[in-house]
Amino acid sequence: DEDGMNTLGFQEEPELERVLGATGFTVDTLTGRILESDIFFNAIFPWSVAQSGAAGRFDLESTAVHEIGHFIGLGHSAIGETELVGTGRRVTAKQAVMFPIAFPTGNISDRVLKPDDIAGASDIYPGGDFSRSTGSISGRVLLAGRGIFGAHVTAFSLASGRIVGGFTLDGEGRFVIAGLEPGLHVVRVEPLDDGDIDSFFSDDADVELDFIATTAPSLVSVPRGGSSGDVTIEVRAR
């Protein structure tokens, strides 16, 4: 409800059988400012607040960290791997708390922010040193000479192994990945195939999925406090 308060609490939502929690917003449509945000945790699931987690129970802190990411304006990250199990998906690995699918019960890994989460939050709310101490990679993803929308682009730091991702967000196939540590990065493009499309984009978004995952032909150097300059990656249809 719109009451001017930000509320966190438990609520039984049996029809949301795959949803551990959710965050709702009241947004000023003129400025984009978040006026109010409420978080609920689905009480139909077994929960735990044990320091080391508990077998058969979902970790409340991990889910809260994810939902608070939405609370401050973060969307979902696609840095994760899943496998199909029945009618759903099971996470096999991920490097972002903001990946849309939780680890199985007993896991507490998502209590700790990953580089992709930190880069996203810092991009929205930059500290005094953020823009000066990090850099970015920008460019385009092309399929048969045309830009594609919704491709997942990642930057992997050779120095630290940190991974930060982003998406192509227009019909020209343009992307920007900010919050990167200076140095050489491997840039990779892949289709969104480890989560439901509507976890990342609206139902009517024209997301391109029919292409082969591709790595940029050369390493990309990220300068401190600046941008790599445009990087063009050409992908092939599959």
Task: Give the role of each language-model region.
Residues F40-F41, A119-G120, I124-F130, V231-R238:
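Conserved "repeat-terminator" motif of extracellular CCP/Sushi domains
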Residues I34-D38, A93, T134, I148, ...:
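Extracytoplasmic
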Residues L192-T232, R236-A237:
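Structured interaction patches on ligand/partner-binding surfaces of diverse proteins
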Residues D1-V91, H152-V153, G166-T168, E172-L180, ...:
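Metzincin-family zinc-dependent endopeptidase catalytic domain
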Residues G135-L143, G173, I233:
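A short, amphipathic beta-strand motif
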Residues G139-A151, F156-A159, P223:
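Structural motif
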Residues S136, I148-H152, L184-V186, D230:
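Exposed beta-strand and adjacent loop surfaces of beta-rich binding modules
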Residues D110-G135, L143:
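Beta-strand-rich domain onsets/edges
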